[in-house]
């Protein structure tokens, strides 16, 4: 169980004065209907307490009516697609409750007031034009940051342009570790032009928007058989996607291909 593993880690961390880093990954809300169809398209029935589904003690399932869910703009308005989205929303609620358990463990270990918490995802929504694409639905990921710094803003949404590339320099900044010198890196360009950079300053003050604001993205293969290299740059006004091998057929991920939405 994730919460027990987190508890075990924090107990070890409390035996030393050294700073620690904990990465917790959840399967939710990934698809799993292509490998475990008995649990539903997103394994939304797994652990629900239904006959044959097992039970997750800390999870109270939330269900959504397929004809009432709000659809993202890029998903077709059909009953199969709506049922697909409703199933994912159920697993999102399971994820939400799982994150709450992790936060509770951090609090119980006495680290609620000295831990920087970053919540995000690894890719966009697994629907058409989403994951494995560099269209906006494929790049949009949640980013919630909670800082114990008393100077940090609370309960505010930011318009700062950041990407997951910024997490590493942010963590180095948090630990007061200097970023590598250019001559020490394999790719000197990685540290040029302040990109990526720490977003800790954003937690204290909203940056002034600039025409030079930009984030970068890349996609090469989601699976070893899904090679289709793409690169993208997004500014506040424009976006450019460069398909490096545009003449080849675009590969569709297996779990998306067999999904109710795609079929």
What residue spans do the PLM features occupy?
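Basic phosphate/pyrophosphate-binding loop/patch that engages nucleotide-derived ligands
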Residues: 15, 107, 204-210
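Active-site-proximal cap/lid insertion segments
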Residues: 9-168, 172-193, 219, 232, ...
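Two-component system phosphotransfer/interaction surface
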Residues: 169-172, 199-200, 204
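His-Asp-centered acyl/peptidyl-transfer active-site segments
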Residues: 209-212, 216, 228
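Polar, glycine-rich mid-to-C-terminal structural blocks
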Residues: 196-201, 212-215
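Acidic, His- and aromatic-enriched active-site or binding-groove loops in soluble protein domains
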Residues: 2-7
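P-loop NTPase catalytic cores that bind/hydrolyze ATP
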Residues: 238
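Extended ligand-binding clefts on enzyme/binding-domain cores
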Residues: 225-229, 235
